[in-house]
């Protein structure tokens, strides 16, 4: 017995194909609509102020001013982001000797982001009668023409190995410590070739050794506070702090009277009660700090 073949409903197939065509046209219209919108958005972005660079978010600069960075970015005419060459801008910025590294990141909209990594100014010196900065690797920026920040010590009289020793010491200090020093002068003696004089910004003179000054100067704020001062902040008993060996306060009277031959490690003989108290307070302050550090 032969199996009967089912009849195909032509009307049903026609209706199904019709619905499929309608659905396909809807999808096609949707795709075309989306493409049109995308093209319009691109045109709006490219030919309206939306794509203009109007500002820059600058981070990491300390010595180099924002105005100097903006000048090298060259965005005052509001260039369009997609046409702006960040590589060229980075090259211009790196011509500043205080800038070590710089990266410029662009998004679809402004501002652009500028990340600056600067060299650290560890000292100020004189080159051909011009005050110029010295950076962390010991390089003197001889052609530096901008204003030198007044937050690093001025150094004088250092050459050769002793200059290298001083640079090493300054590298070990943090920015806050260096900023407390106004000037450093080389003052070698026969028995102490590494002796230096530091003139602090609070008016106190410090004598030290280039090999140990970085470690000892960390305690300077407490040393300074331990010394008795008048209402104007000046020392009641003028003198200097000797850090060449240990920590000692030496009144200038002792030096003038010949009680100490130099700013050396020699202990000062007992003076007046106020002198002894100043020395004791200074030594106690240093001992206290060292005890606290060792207990951490």
From Swiss-Prot:
Signal peptide: none annotated. Keywords: Cell cycle, Cell division, Cell membrane, Membrane, Transmembrane, Transmembrane helix. Residues 256-296 are annotated as: Disordered. It is a single-pass type II membrane protein. It is found in: Cell membrane. GO terms for biological process: FtsZ-dependent cytokinesis. It holds the Pfam family POTRA_1. PANTHER family: CELL DIVISION PROTEIN DIVIB, CELL DIVISION PROTEIN FTSQ. Belongs to the FtsQ/DivIB family. DivIB subfamily. This is Cell division protein DivIB. The lineage of its organism: Bacteria, Bacillati, Bacillota, Bacilli, Bacillales.
